[in-house]
């Protein structure tokens, strides 16, 4: 079961600030500061969250000032026995500062006399209590408060050691991001709610921020993240596009964030997304986010060594549940199971628990044959929106792997129903489409086509169409599959994952259905460097499976065997996907064509042992038994 988190968990994309300060008189390059909540003495509630968020935006665009992230604040509050959404008073900020080894706290305040406002920003050493820097600005009215705060923050940055040239270069005024205090407050509430209650609860706040300011780029990308985390890919792309169109209104850090999200999830141009992450990491070397997301990209492309390097860099800067889950998952991919278990154990020692960790535990249980532990992980997901459906679909894969198709169908249906209940129709449609692929591969074309029709009727999103096109081609329904492929190639001309993996898979499937194995092998050539990856929507190792089938059709037994042996060589990649067990049958067929009866018998026996409890009457099982009997 593969659960790689980026959008699935969303944590890499949470709005945060980062990167160190540099002046020997105040802060060193590796120091971190903690933002306290604003001391609002005006009685006007609009300032409560808006000004802290505005200050975070202002200080966060600095490549030198590293602010303790919201995620780290929440984790530390839990260790302190407090709720993750507790107010960060000066005393709480000092304790956070000491516990996290930070250097200073930043205190903000606002007071008024009539229509005049005074904004203060102080940096105080958390151990000594000494004031490191102090700024005060006046505003002639509420509309000028954000401008005054921007001036105070810029001056504070220079006093904390940042060069004037840097401050001038990285100084987009917060009022350019949004001039609306109300919008900023709603956005801040969305960030906090998403972190503490989940994505679905955060959406109304992000929508409200956009209603108040239709040019609020950060709110659009925040909403895009929430939708993506809920599997609503079309709405995620729509809002990411709006954020990208408004990217000139944000700081350089946010521009990197928006651009990377846009290229990765709207156009699918992974090369450009990678470039944005690399520039982000270079400009903000203390920010873990670009490293974590580069790790995700490399993993999807099957470049696991690179993925480990980047994910470890993320964890070195700021350990997180997503980082632990992705690192353990990549260790599983490269069969370093001991290190995967150690990584999960370290996460659990820090009380991290969530979908990525549970998905890794499920994968380890599957690889070790521990059915009881697999059941425990699935039970953990029960009743958890956005997580239950993932675990159920993973369990459906396992049932199909062993030929228990009725159970797989039931689990796929339950997974889809769970996703729909969570307002994630696109995700639910994907689970139905995955079942269509299972039906196609075991020889049930009618059931496969019915599942495709159901999935497309529920939510005909891009990823659903990709899976549907594969399933249709594998059942011989070439006309509809080709129509979907043509439309995708027209609408997604730059999408890296589609160009190097999924388009070749669909084209090869069509060629095989048309008895053209030579064309199938040629179609799969672009996938060769990436065939061990699992690009979204995520079915591992389809290219070598189809290439093996093409060689079988050519009666080239040795070449076919070489392809199917890749599955035995990479158990951590294929895991519990149906193709992993079917590859054993196909290996037997390859050996039979080659005239190696002993190896053919062994491979058939291996498959039939895996499927000893399979449902009766499955077409591919009936074929396998008949073929095996002829070898006796």
Task: Name these PLM-found stretches.
Residues 230, 262-266, 363-366, 533, ...:
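Glycine-centered coil turns and helix-coil junctions that link the paired helices
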